[in-house]
Swiss-Prot record:
Its EC number is 2.8.1.8. Transmembrane segments: none annotated. This is Lipoyl synthase. Binds 2 [4Fe-4S] clusters per subunit. One cluster is coordinated with 3 cysteines and an exchangeable S-adenosyl-L-methionine. PANTHER family: LIPOYL SYNTHASE, LIPOYL SYNTHASE, MITOCHONDRIAL. One of its GO terms (cellular component) is cytoplasm. The keyword Protein biosynthesis does not apply. [4Fe-4S] cluster 2 binds at C86, C90, C93. GO terms for molecular function: 4 iron, 4 sulfur cluster binding; lipoate synthase activity; metal ion binding. Its cofactor is [4Fe-4S] cluster. InterPro entries: Aldolase_TIM, Elp3/MiaA/NifB-like_rSAM, LIAS_N, Lipoyl_synth, rSAM.
Amino acid sequence: MVTVLDAIANAPRLRHPEKAHKPDQEVLRKPDWIRVKAPVSKGYAETREIVKSHKLVTVCEEAGCPNIGECWEKKHATFMIMGEICTRACAFCNVATGIPTALDPDEPARVAHAVKQMGLSHVVITSVDRDDLADGGAQHFADVIRAIRAATPSTTIEILTPDFLRKDGALEIVVAARPDVFNHNLETVPSNYLKVRPGARYFHSIRLLQRVKELDPSIFTKSGIMVGLGEERNEILQLMDDLRSANVDFMTIGQYLQPSKKHHPVIRFVTPEEFKSFETIGRTKGFLLVASSPLTRSSHHAGDDFARLRAAREAQLQKSV
């Protein structure tokens, strides 16, 4: 006999249960400058096969990144560790929310093997938020970094981390593993936090980035925001100043794209000209590098940007001699 419990047990899992009760938001039509081609290349298919064969998760897929076709064609992928379920529910994010599973102790080795198989000279590792773990997943991040170093020592490593909010000693564990780039995104201006990023605290994120530099000045620090969420221009400029006060080296700015009708709406599409002006202003404020365009994302062109970062630092050091 089939009961209502059987129906519930077999029902598909809601990707965003916390958003199910929210009213639908209009999804604005994208302007021409945001259109991208569907991913159909041979390189894309090969990258997808490597990811699946190692049972790995990528933020490219989970977050619905518009650049997935371009990046995967070039065998570039951003690996998302610690599962595919996040303990937070940011209004902009397409990653699934809920109760995550236990950490997989074999994941560091599988990520390292995939990095070696793909021949990556630069790799980006990110994660879901794991507020359920005592260290927020810091030791797992460190284990992944060290596994990659052991498997392919020449590969440079960039990490995009959560904020490890209220996890004493977590940041120190990650920094001790010595990633080449430490990225932690502010995501938006502080006035938007309660509605866009309610589980985080703006000035905690600023302090985290500052603390990375205090612990190891040789590590490049990086942070990014989305625009089109209702922020004012002067708020973006103040955010730039806040990042520079924390000695952040690299800033990324991209257009927010609404994943579904249940997510925060796009308030407006920022023009390419405005993005260019943010890049110019950011450079005058002292960032070593600013990437600002409608399709800019944290790990888009990360390898090329790392080379530019190193060159910019060397040029800066030469000037100070």
